[in-house]
Amino acid sequence: MASAVFEGTSLVNMFVRGCWVNGIRRLIVSRRGDEEEFFEIRTEWSDRSVLYLHRSLADLGRLWQRLRDAFPEDRSELAQGPLRQGLVAIKEAHDIETRLNEVEKLLKTIISMPCKYSRSEVVLTFFERSPLDQVLKNDNVHKIQPSFQSPVKISEIMRSNGFCLANTETIVIDHSIPNGRDQQLGVDPTEHLFENGSEFPSELEDGDDPAAYVTNLSYYHLVPFETDIWD
């Protein structure tokens, strides 16, 4: 059961002051080329440090489930509260901008909850940087290859660290892409919202250009510096 104060890692006595959703990345999460959408989240902590995280809709669903498990006395309230409504709104969003706004709204709801929840181990662990976040921050997966005798996919490295999420390359979204790819973006990644795994089959072509990127940035997000105590 999660405690009201998180003592599991270096995040003790810290909490998330604000969070914003900057955009979406599509990452390959299996050897078959299945893709999943990850929201890029900018978080500001109580010590003014900033972390950039990547979380999927499935991650948000698991957070909701873990909160209910961690606080069984409040299970019915959490099950019918704003978190559930927020997840449904994200799932039903029909365009990228609406989805980004709904994710941001849900995250702000979470960090605005009573300290019992917002500073619990469950929530702070969700906002802690993961190995996947570190790989995407470096934006160069080849840096970790020399640690292995033979070529290895990021998926294998992530699983060895206890993560089932991974990427072998970064696929990003742009509104100017050909119509053929528009059909690919129509896949709803929220169909299996409350399941641990979900499938997003798609066929990738060689030479995909990862330069395009869908953003949800305001002036505040464009501040040209980052304070990060985790480096």
Swiss-Prot record:
Protein name as annotated: PX domain-containing protein 1
SUPFAM superfamilies: PX domain (SSF64268)
PX domain boundaries: 1-134
Gene field: PXDC1
Organism: Homo sapiens (Human)
GO molecular function: phosphatidylinositol binding
